[in-house]
Amino acid sequence: MYIGSDFMKDKYLMINTSVLPDVFEKVIEAKELMKAGKIKEITEAVKVVGISRSTYYKYKDYVFNVSELSSNQKVIISVTLNHRPGTLSKILDKIALYKGNILTINQEIPIHNTANVNITFDISQLNIEFNRLLEEISAMDNVIKLDLIAMD
């Protein structure tokens, strides 16, 4: 859902829609029409809800229903690491410590002592705030960069 997030800078607020411009609700409505399969193309969805395509694309990755967020169970993170023994294992241990369930690990061959790893895991049973877990992983030794790639 959210591509290329810089979670360390992102801030999330829960706001009553009555104080927001209608455009945000319309973006959500367009997303829901597409997700439900009622409308197949974005052009049609934005026409039905009354917003422009550019408005839709501007906000689609930043506006969510609370119910949409609470249903997120799987996340994909991309981690760039210094290639050192035990680094990936420590990251996996950290996720497991807070009751994250590892689903897949995709690791590229290290080049110039740098490795890229994508980790998909279930966060439905996490006993720590998700952003806090990402901050802890990001602060670990040999972690160069961490990006949130997707939530589902």
From Swiss-Prot:
InterPro entries according to UniProt: ACT-like_dom_sf, ACT_dom, UPF0735_ACT_dom-cont
SUPFAM superfamilies according to UniProt: ACT-like (SSF55021)
CDD domains (UniProt xref): ACT_PheB-BS
Annotated ranges, domain ACT: 76-151
Domain of life: Bacteria
Family affiliation: Belongs to the UPF0735 family.
Protein name: UPF0735 ACT domain-containing protein CTC_00116
Organism of derivation: Clostridium tetani (strain Massachusetts / E88)
